[in-house]
From Swiss-Prot:
UniProt KW keywords: Isoprene biosynthesis, Lyase, Metal-binding
Pfam families to which the protein is assigned, alphabetical: YgbB
Name assigned to this protein: 2-C-methyl-D-erythritol 2,4-cyclodiphosphate synthase
EC number assigned by the record: 4.6.1.12
Keyword Lyase on entry: yes
Classification lineage: Bacteria, Pseudomonadati, Bacteroidota, Bacteroidia, Bacteroidales
Main function: Involved in the biosynthesis of isopentenyl diphosphate (IPP) and dimethylallyl diphosphate (DMAPP), two major building blocks of isoprenoid compounds. Catalyzes the conversion of 4-diphosphocytidyl-2-C-methyl-D-erythritol 2-phosphate (CDP-ME2P) to 2-C-methyl-D-erythritol 2,4-cyclodiphosphate (ME-CPP) with a corresponding release of cytidine 5-monophosphate (CMP).
Length: 162
């Protein structure tokens, strides 16, 4: 019997480096550094993908879209998010909601949250109110505090489709 609700958790981190664009939640942000990665390194979308896939017991983003596969080199993470949501829907689930937190000292992300919510909701095909995003710092502690990288955490609630 299919469970009526499933919850998944996702986490991702990428190194900040000069010479890369900074993508966050599908929105390109102006900053002196960007995130390194095989794809566009959008840590927020990657954490959300892992939360969605985990909730549906479909493993993780690296399993479905491995960095060893050249077709994913430089890919727009919004494409990965759309595919992850297709996989979730193929299992008979719809999104209840997402709650995610981004940890970064710079740039300040709060002004960009409404744009990120709109982009993510459009890609996943849900209401903006189904996407909760928060930004925090680590009070200058650890690799995020030293501005060496950015991390993101996400929880997704799935609801059995009727």
């Amino acid at each position: 019997m299919k469970k009526p609700f499933r919850i998944g958790f996702g986490f991702d981190v990428h190194r900040l480096s000069e010479g890369y664009p900074l993508w966050m939640g599908g929105v390109r942000l102006e900053h002196s550094k960007g995130l390194e990665g095989h794809s566009d390194a959008d840590v927020l979308i990657h954490a959300i993908c892992d939360a969605l896939l985990g909730a549906a017991a479909l493993r993780d983003i690296g399993y479905h879209f491995p960095p060893s596969d050249p077709q994913y080199k430089g890919i727009d993470s919004k494409i990965l998010l759309a595919r992850a949501m297709e996989l979730v829907r193929s299992q008979g689930y719809e999104l209840g909601n997402i709650d995610a937190t981004i940890a970064a000292e710079q740039p300040k992300l709060n002004p960009h949250i409404p744009d990120m919510q709109r982009v993510l909701a459009e890609v996943i095909q849900v209401e903006v109110s189904d996407i909760s995003l928060k930004a925090t710092t680590t009070e200058k502690l650890g690799f995020t505090g030293r501005e060496e990288g950015i991390s993101a955490y996400a929880v997704a609630l799935l609801i059995a489709a009727v």
